[in-house]
Amino acid sequence: VLLALFCLSLANVPSTFAADSPAPPLSALTFRMAGDDLRTRIVVMFDREPKLSTRLFGNPHRLVIDLPETRFGFDEKSLEARGLVSHVRYGLAGKGCSRLILTLRGPFDVENLRVLKNENASGYRLVADIVATSDRKFAEKLKEQKGKTGSTERTRQQVAGSALPGDGKPRPFTVMIDPGHGGIDSGAESLSGIKEKNLTLAFGKELRDRLSHERNIKVLMTREDDTFLRLAERVRLARQHEADLFISIHADTINQHDIRGATVYTISDKASDAVARAMAERENKSDSLAGALPEEQPEVTDILLDLTRRETHTFSLSFAEKVIGELQGQVNLINNPHRFAGFQVLRAPDVPSVLIEIGYLSNPEDEKLISNPEWRKKLADRIALAVKAFAARKRPSNLSGG
């Protein structure tokens, strides 16, 4: 119905104009994307100012851009999946109308969409910043869209097929456990052949099982099997599920084989020491080592986002100290156990995040302990106590989920 009205309005031109030669179709000249699984920018160049409308759909998550009849001159290579966008389609959608459809990897929001006149050339460009969001917030957007566009059957279906806001029950404290590496990315490996990806998954499941006994704590995992995930995808999952805490589990190797013990890392642009810097550089290369190309991130300047990051960082520091407090005297810790560096997996602006190295596979004593299920159970118990204490202090700000 909406598309028909949109097309009709475009076709309703004065009769004096209709007597002349029809206006040529709009030309969409180029399509570009840049970003990652958290934020992606699309730029479409047009020969003249486009009149357009946009809609969001669920199942699958899509952004639909309706245009007047348009000739598309896109380079097919520019349409390859990138960042949040998994698929791009375009073409005629009825008499006098064309459509551009972006399929997204998960729930999203269009943070900023504008049509700008080109400064140094003819034509106009459409610029849209698409950001990952939670299932709840995406459902709210669909509900808001329904209110604006009327109660059509299509809109009812898309809302019904998506997670709706909370039903008034208190929202549990949500912990996202991230077993490092996986799939083609094995991570570190001990001299005896133990792979980091297997140990992190085993411990992640043990920590999940331990936390599942706590009241009002919901536990999710970025992976529950031997699956490869990009670093940004891990962060996106935490944000999609509105996690209140993100714990990434690792067990690395280091050239100095005498170094051993658990370490808790938080994010910082400046590394606390050479070991932390080297660790972050190695972990941040996980994507490229597994064959996933690094993706350019659109520059974002937002005062509110910066304030959110600062608050989140404070919570991350608080949880890191709680973990160390629970581990001291119970398991071996590295000297100065709270360290920091620029880990990509810790960069969610609104989810307190830590990376816990449970030990070093390059140290024979650590390797023996990490491989022991009883020792891992003890470690999981101590971390669970820290999570419980942190959850008691930082309950979800939106208790109703709405």
Language-model features: locations:
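A short, glycine/Asx- and small/polar-enriched loop/turn
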Residues: S122, D258-R260, A348-S353
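Short, solvent-exposed loop/turn elements at domain surfaces
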Residues: S53-R55, F74-D75, I184-A188, A274, ...
